[in-house]
UniProtKB/Swiss-Prot annotation:
Keywords, alphabetical: 4Fe-4S, Iron, Iron-sulfur, Metal-binding, Methyltransferase, rRNA processing, S-adenosyl-L-methionine, Transferase
Name of the protein described by the UniProt record: 23S rRNA (uracil(1939)-C(5))-methyltransferase RlmD
Ranges where the TRAM domain occurs: 1-55
Pfam families in the record: TRAM, tRNA_U5-meth_tr
Protein family (similarity comment): Belongs to the class I-like SAM-binding methyltransferase superfamily. RNA M5U methyltransferase family. RlmD subfamily.
GO MF annotation list: 4 iron, 4 sulfur cluster binding; iron ion binding; RNA binding; rRNA (uridine-C5-)-methyltransferase activity
Function noted in UniProt: Catalyzes the formation of 5-methyl-uridine at position 1939 (m5U1939) in 23S rRNA.
Binding site for [4Fe-4S] cluster: 68, 74, 77, 156
Listed InterPro entries: 23S_rRNA_MeTrfase_RlmD (IPR001566), MeTrfase_TrmA_AS (IPR030390), MeTrfase_TrmA_CS (IPR030391), NA-bd_OB-fold (IPR012340), SAM-dependent_MTases_sf (IPR029063), TRAM_dom (IPR002792), U5_MeTrfase_fam (IPR010280)
Species in which this protein is naturally found: Bordetella avium (strain 197N)
């Protein structure tokens, strides 16, 4: 049913227009801020509705024609109909709003956004595979939007052109395998001049399958890696391909090798800009000792080691820290780097003190954030704490949560923050924030007030528990 005309006020990070009707929020798929649209309601909830655009009556000046013919069906992109600079502005607003709503803080300065290529930027991707006879056989691509179905993709403009051109040949190749229905996914990882494809196969491959893979690799100049079970089972079909994937950071003289299933940034161009900005914001001095928490393969640790006295990388996986150490040695940085393997989701202040004093700190956690690290930092005395911290985030909500701890309990100031457009045309918000410690007496005051507040909250909770227990013992 087509509803009355809706006026779109804003946009959420799923690229849904937000309108209001009779006091209820309406999320309108396909609409942009400032537009007047006819929309069909597709779902009604007590506090909100979801609708779909039927007709755009007054188009936004920010509306553009999506480049991809699959846009709107494929779930890989959500914002191709919105002009790229407007996409970034929406992400910046979302970041600032989240800081305030979650943490009751605002950055003193908004950093200019980091921009990079908006098309052909995805150097990593996970493509699902399904055998669907009704759609002509095998499908290879991203999931449909909000669905477990695989989109019928024939091209993809956020993948590099040569990878997009593989989508149809991959369909034919998988169809030629002995058990195509037992191939659930293919991961794509690109290095400089190298394209690696990781084939997830639930059942063992036979000689015929191996021949098909080798023929495809020779015809399309790709490497095949095979994965029969978990990540530890990944290995190259050709052993000579074991250490050929890499990305470079020429401004630091670094070449970073990695395996196709390792975590590396999707957008190599933005990664270089991000690392450069992080180091500039940290203001590392030649005498500084710097910590890099959640260091992974050393994406920040090795550049930090080129500028400071010592860079200490900490990561939960020993396999990653071992390889980061190998990369450091390959560049002659073993004397200026150290790596530790620790679960950073369970650290406390005594662990942090055990690592020694750091002049600067970089934190780059996964989506879960760095809650335990933020709590430990907030308990350090003025003499023990890093004076400046840069936090790189892929989740505004956990960044705001951790920032609130550092500011309201630890005596840090949120000096600056801004977005990194790592994933153009999606709602994903990557960001970077800079924290600086207050003066020593101000830090002590903030920490004391936080302790008093926590003690009062604990006392009130205990009293409420006693009262609830007493009430439950009263006769009916």
């Amino acid at each position: 049913m087509v509803d009355e005309v809706l006026k779109i006020e804003s946009l959420d990070l799923e690229a849904r227009g937000i309108a209001r009707r009779d006091g209820k929020v309406v999320f309108v798929e396909g609409a942009l801020p400032g537009e007047r649209v006819y929309a069909a309601t597709v779902r009604r909830k007590p506090s909100y509705e979801i609708a779909r655009v039927e007709t755009v009556l007054t188009p936004s000046s920010q509306r553009v024609e999506p480049r991809c013919p699959h846009f709107g069906v494929c779930g890989g992109c959500a914002m191709q109909h919105l002009e790229p600079t407007s996409q970034v502005a929406i992400k910046q607003r979302a970041l600032e709003d989240t800081f305030w709503h979650v943490g009751k803080i605002r950055p003193q300065r908004v950093l200019p956004p980091l921009h990079g290529p908006t098309w052909g930027y995805r150097y990593r991707a996970r493509l699902s595979v399904r055998v669907v006879p009704k759609k002509g056989g095998v499908l290879v691509g991203f999931h449909e939007r909000k669905s477990s179905y695989v989109a019928d993709m024939r091209e993809c403009h956020v993948l590099p052109r040569h990878v997009s051109d593989l989508l149809l040949p991959l369909r034919a190749m998988i169809a030629a395998l002995s058990r195509p229905e037992r191939i659930p996914q293919i991961e794509v990882a690109l290095g400089e001049g190298v394209t690696a494809l990781v084939l997830r196969h639930i059942e063992p491959l036979n000689d015929h399958d191996i021949t098909v893979l080798r023929d495809f690799a020779a015809r399309h100049n790709v490497q095949w890696w095979l994965q029969s079970k978990g990540p530890d089972t990944v290995h190259p079909l050709d052993p000579a391909h074991g250490d050929t994937l890499a990305y470079t950071m020429p401004e630091f003289g670094l070449r970073m090798p990695y395996r196709p299933t390792d975590f590396t940034q999707v957008n190599h161009a933005i990664n270089r800009s991000m690392v450069s900005r992080a180091l500039k914001l940290l203001e590392v001095q030649p005498t500084d000792r710097v910590a890099d928490l959640f260091c992974g393969l050393g994406n920040f640790t090795l550049p930090l080691a080129t500028q400071g006295r010592e860079a200490v990388g900490v990561e939960g996986s020993k396999a990653l820290t071992d390889r980061a150490l190998e990369a450091a040695a390959r560049h002659g940085l073993e004397g200026r780097t150290r790596f530790a393997t620790l679960n950073l989701f369970e650290v406390d202040v005594s662990w942090l003190r055990g690592l020694g004093y750091f002049d600067r700190m970089l934190i780059d956690p996964p989506r879960e954030g760095a809650h335990a690290v933020a709590q430990a930092l907030s308990q350090l005395t003025p003499a023990e704490r890093p004076r400046r911290i840069v936090y790189v985030s892929c989740n505004p909500a956990t960044l705001a949560r951790d920032a609130a701890i550092m500011v309201h309990e630890g005596g840090y100031v949120l000096k600056a923050a801004g977005v990194i457009n790592m994933f153009p045309h999606t709602g994903h918000v990557e960001s970077i924030a800079v924290f600086e410690s207050l003066a020593d007496d101000e830090v002590l005051h903030v920490q004391q007030q936080a302790r008093l507040k926590a003690e009062l909250a604990a006392q009130e909770a205990a009293e409420a528990t006693v009262q609830a227990g007493a009430a439950s013992e009263q006769p009916a």
